[in-house]
Amino acid sequence: MSGAFRLRCRGVDIDAGRPLVMGVVNATPDSFSDGAEMANRPAQFARVDELVAAGADILDIGGQSAITGVPEISVDEEIERITPVVERAVAAGAIVSVDTYRAEVADAALSLGAHIINDISALKDPRMADVLAARDAGYVLMHNPGRPKVRLTETNLYDDVVDAVVEFWTEGLDRLRSAGVADEAVILDFGPDFAKTPHQTLQCLREWERLAGFRRPLLMALSRKDFIGTALRLVPRERDEATLAAMVWIASKVPSVIARTHRPLELRQAFDMLGFLDGRADLHPDDRLDPSLRRQGVTPST
């Protein structure tokens, strides 16, 4: 395991020196992407099982949508939404991330066996860092100068958006260290679409080398995001192929990537193929294609 990209959460070591797949489980009826499909418990459980079978390295479970203009739910309701889903994922042996910005919800999730807290607010809850330290939890530190559920509409927030991300991460890491959270528990996320125009999100991706300088795994939450829809004029459910292209491109460049996706099987296969292309995996000179894999759906003649 590469020491520089060692990720340790709740006593579990995760090899982040290769591209990892984070599959999304929305335990909420109002997700921008698939809320209607995931509004009931059987669908959420089926999604957990699907992600595990598809080879997702991490499952990211959220009980409250980040959509602005939708009222914030209570802490109790958020905990009620995620509890059975977290229990299902933990029982399946998955590494579990919970998407919440509230320390009370984070503590409840970690008590159920979750490993990572994915916080879109970047420690806006003053109790969050102490919860992380007490539970020895992993943490996603996302660049977001705004508050949860509030859309920042200004387009001139930054002289240089990448400079702003770097400064924000530096300050956040200092706060986490002061609370007793080790660097090896931290994942960094530049926050695509959050307080950013589509152009600014694209700029962060193009200047990936500056973001990779922290030598921490980078969460790339690019799946179905606005910058893709803006570039190609597509609604969320039509953005999966373009998402795959963006994910493979960034994974071919950044040394340690965790890709958050709604389509884990395709991304897992793409990352595995990337491993053959960049030399992390290889074929033996005598390897040949199994004849049963040569054609699709052909039945032998009699």
Stretches found by the model and what they are:
Residues 29:
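Catalytic-pocket segment enriched in acidic/His residues
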Residues 2, 7-9, 16, 33-47, ...:
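Active-site-adjacent loop and "lid" segments of alpha/beta metabolic enzymes
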Residues 22, 56, 95, 115, ...:
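Hydrophobic "anchor" residues on beta-strands that sit immediately upstream
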Residues 17-24, 50-62:
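N-terminal glycine-rich anion-binding loops that anchor highly charged ligand groups
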Residues 53, 94, 170-185:
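Phosphate/pyrophosphate-binding loops at sites that engage ATP/ADP/AMP, CoA/4′-phosphopantetheine
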